Swiss-Prot record:
Protein name stated in the entry: Probable fucosyltransferase 9
Gene Ontology molecular function, alphabetical: fucosyltransferase activity; galactoside 2-alpha-L-fucosyltransferase activity
Family: Belongs to the glycosyltransferase 37 family.
GN (gene name): FUT9
Organism from which the protein derives: Arabidopsis thaliana (Mouse-ear cress)
Keywords, ordered alphabetically: Cell wall biogenesis/degradation, Glycoprotein, Glycosyltransferase, Golgi apparatus, Membrane, Signal-anchor, Transferase, Transmembrane, Transmembrane helix
Tissues with expression: Expressed in leaves and stems.
Positions in the Lumenal compartment: 22-474
Amino acid sequence: MIKLTIAIATCLVLCLVLLLPSSNISYRHKYDLPTNGLNDSEQQSEKLLGGLLATGFEEKSCLSRYDQSMSKPSPYKPSRHIVSKLRSYEMLHKRCGPGTKAYKRATKQLGHNELSSSGDECRYVVWMPMFGLGNRMLSLVSVFLYALLTDRVMLVDQRNDITDLFCEPFPETSWLLPLDFPLNDQLDSFNREHSRCYGTMLKNHGINSTSIIPSHLYLDIFHDSRDHDKKFFCEEDQAFLDKVTWLVVKSNLYFVPSLWMIPSFQTKLIKLFPQKETVFHHLARYLFHPTNQVWGMVTRSYNAYLSRADERLGIQVRVFSKPVGYFQHVMDQILYSDHLKNMFLEQASSTGETIEVYQPSGEKIQQTDKKLHDQKALAEIYLLSLTDELVTSTRSTFGYVAQGLGGLKPWILYEPRDKKTPNPPCVRAMSMEPCFLRAPLHGCQAKTIKIPPFVRICEDWKTGLKLVDVSDEL
């Protein structure tokens, strides 16, 4: 007899500038450990995600890094080019990262306009956490890909809770921006009105072919960024930015699709990712390794409620309510898991399956930057990623991350209008890639939008772009 487990997780998800509730429901297949039937070499390859992960880490300090016992082997294998690029990046980060002579030289240049260029100097991109956890993970992967393409070292602002969520991803070095970084007291003040904002400098004609190269610039890549800020995605602007030692990025978006629209990047990206829809899947599994505390939440929930199921389905429901508030219809939707539990306890399914309903947590308000709340949210994302099938909601960054980590093409629930179910109510995603919700659909990229066959308008948002593999389109 088939056993179907339904796990329901509730949390509030912050997407774009709105505080939006979401409910997550999880169900899934029971697997034997993925190493069963594999020889030693195949087991090692699976442990390292086909070569994505480096060896040399102390395993007990970050159990999630090599633990594949709860997931199926991914059918998407990384190319030898991305594996080689990651190993090269690790060497670069080790040579240029915090505490090195190169890092100290680079920080001394901050505040000076006349920059010495010796050819072997290191360049950096600093990631700043913005908005909710889903937005942060999407933008972090985007910035990391930009670092790979431009041979920069990526450092992340550690002043929030990132060390409570994720282990260090790079061997024998740190991705954390040191607390004594010379610009630390200015980072929070970086905005589009700042004198070092690239878009503002363009708007004020502060940058031209004869401009002195600044030591650092701030890049504003948000859902409401101005046209001048979107010049970041233009080839000629990248040529200028390439000369700047320090870039600071604030973003709440997955802007990877538009990196593919930059001609000099596209050539590299096609080699790195011959399967276009695997960018987030590979880079997220490389970068993100939950801390032991978070991984404990995942494994305890999985082993207690999901491991014995024959099939698991994850449902992530995002509620669109304006103005943001505590509405009864929202709570009715969140508490629907209790109704499902009672229904399946009182009567069997028509085909005889055993069906269970599970709700990992019951968070009712968004509490970004509160340690335990963010840890629970991350654990729920991973539980959703461990499903066989996934249903997500329109424009949900929470859902985007789960589908990408799990290598899943979800069914996407359309946004209700006037509290009525749309017809049709959902659509199958073209790919497992997240949507760049506010892609620059005009300007320097307007002429190239229709050319690449691997870029499509998102199913869930008409101003968004996503990567697809054309042969896999439905």
